């Protein structure tokens, strides 16, 4: 179950790339972030209020300060990540659409993004082989994957659903077994390969959204 559920954030990032890869910089676009900020503040205060009712909330001044450092709600890291990605999207789209007529240009972008963020969790399993400095940039990689799925959706639709489902179930089985053995007789081991930037999560995300 965890192997599937951890794809929720990556799926949202891929969907963002799928839907927003044509957005351009404008005042209207920048102002589009305001509803996100308002929702974040409202939800953070709501969470603080509920925790306060059960005696687990901080004082009000700490809650207000926590809004600015994303600590009032424990899941605020996601909003912190998305705000930055949202502001970057017009620039990412310039990269995506700059030389799209060049053969394999988009494939190169996705490959480099995957090489820097996802592959280190696989290739560095038994020792550092490739740089892993850029793993934290996984939101950008998922965004470009979404843009790729949008741009080449007609070609992707030609892949039979049977092959995709088989691949998904096979990957799910293998990853579940490897994670189970890695955590045998101890608490679940949250490691690079099963993190948001891990190759397991990336593979499950791509196969899952391709099926959808």
Question: Predicted regions: what is each one?
Answer:
Residues 2-11, 20-52, 56-76, 80-85, ...:
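Transmembrane alpha-helical segments and their boundary/interface "anchor" motifs
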Residues 2-3, 64-69, 127-136, 189-200:
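Non-cytosolic membrane-interface motifs at loop->transmembrane helix junctions
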Residues 18, 45-53, 57, 87, ...:
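Structural signature of transmembrane alpha-helix termini at the membrane-water interface
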Residues 25, 52-60, 94-102, 122-129, ...:
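Transmembrane helix-loop junctions in multipass membrane proteins, especially transporters and channels
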Residues 43-49, 64, 110-124, 167-183:
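Aromatic-anchored segments of alpha-helical transmembrane domains
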Residues 137, 154-212:
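Alpha-helical transmembrane segments and terminal signal-anchor/GPI-anchor hydrophobic tails
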């Amino acid at each position: 179950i965890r192997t599937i559920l951890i794809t929720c954030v990556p799926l949202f990032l891929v969907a963002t790339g799928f839907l927003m890869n044509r957005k351009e910089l404008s005042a209207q676009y920048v102002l589009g972030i305001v509803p996100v900020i308002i929702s974040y503040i409202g939800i953070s205060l709501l969470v603080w209020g509920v925790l306060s009712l059960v005696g687990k909330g901080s004082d009000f001044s700490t809650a207000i300060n926590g809004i600015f450092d994303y600590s009032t709600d424990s899941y605020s890291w996601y909003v912190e990540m998305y705000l930055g990605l949202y502001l970057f999207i017009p620039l990412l789209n310039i990269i995506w659409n700059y030389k799209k007529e060049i053969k394999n240009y988009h494939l190169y972008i996705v490959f480099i993004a995957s090489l820097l963020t996802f592959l280190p969790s696989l290739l560095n399993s038994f020792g550092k082989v490739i740089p892993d400095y850029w793993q934290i940039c996984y939101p950008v990689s998922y965004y470009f994957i979404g843009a790729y799925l949008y741009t080449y959706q007609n070609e992707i639709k030609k892949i039979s659903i049977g092959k995709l489902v088989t691949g998904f179930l096979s990957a799910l089985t293998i990853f579940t077994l490897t994670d189970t053995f890695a955590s045998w007789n101890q608490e679940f081991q949250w490691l690079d390969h099963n993190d948001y930037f891990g190759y397991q999560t990336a593979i499950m995300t791509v196969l899952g959204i391709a099926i959808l």
